[in-house]
Amino acid sequence: MRTRILLVLFVFALAVAGCGSTVAPVSVSVSAVEPLPAGATEFTATAPAAGNADCDREASWRPGPLPPPGAMPPGSTMAAIAERGRLIAGVDQNTDLFGSRNPATGQLEGFDIDIAREIARAIFGDPDRIQLRVVNAKERESVLQSGEVDVVVRTYSITCERKDVVDFSAVYYEANQKILSAKGSGIDTAAGLAGKRVCAVSGTTSLSKLYELNPRPKIYGATTWTDCLLMLQQGQVDAISTDDAVLKGLAKQDPTVDVVGDSIAKEPYGVGVNKDHQDLVRFVNGVLEKIGQDGTWQRLYDSWLEELGPSPGPPEPRYKD
């Protein structure tokens, strides 16, 4: 509408000038408003359901002794995977440090990618016997339930709500939800988000935690964290809030932003598994115990996450049986 009015004024000015008037030339300026990335929207509804608050979200199924690679128990979920010839893992391609595509090689890489490869190694003796299936945050439960993937290793925070529909391994990494804002913006605490526009990816626990802030910010959901960063760069939001590990990856892409504030919430990451495949959950927990004890977890941390600070060491597993 504004553009149409400006153009009418411009045409009128030309007409006046054509009649011999001494009216000065009219300067026309059309302001371009960048559209939100595809799938991004402002949320005004109430907070998502929290699920069974009484569950122990970090407790998983205790592993037994790991079978040798290539010798999975007959009739097990792992034997079916071995018969297929590859592990299918749902992963991310837009989260630097955990799961992103190397621009030089085109290969997916990161801490989560290597955790998935260790599961493949334990089944086949070869970490390359794996198919990496890119899934977005909102697809994680559905691809597990449908059997499209065997596991999801995608900065997947364990929650009671999610445990109602899928199963999880023990915790393999614990992150903290923080804030990413422009340097000098004055936004450096959760309280500073009051009334501000904040982006988080739809379907994530980060989004849920923003609803709990009081006063509440204006919450925007996007499809990927890269979209959130684009919205911050274009001035469409004032901050991003999610796990510090994810925010550090975004900050590497833009030197004008910084990770700030104390922890808003703890975010324990687990490997997602179909709820009917308890044997695979126990197997994955055996793999996590093994790589925690033999130094592999620490090697992966040093390779991908060292810039996050001193290693906390592999999380202590907690089991419910």
Where are these regions (language model features)?
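C-terminal motif of bacterial Sec signal peptides marking the signal peptidase cleavage site
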Residues: L14-G18
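Acidic, polar ligand-binding/catalytic clefts
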Residues: R117, R121, D128-G192
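Periplasmic-binding protein-like
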Residues: Y173-S181, K248-V287, E307-D321
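Extracytoplasmic small-molecule ligand-binding "clamshell" domains
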Residues: V30-V152
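Bacterial signal peptide processing site
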Residues: G20-V23
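Extended ligand-binding regions for polar small-molecule ligands
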Residues: P37, T41-M72, T204, V271-G309
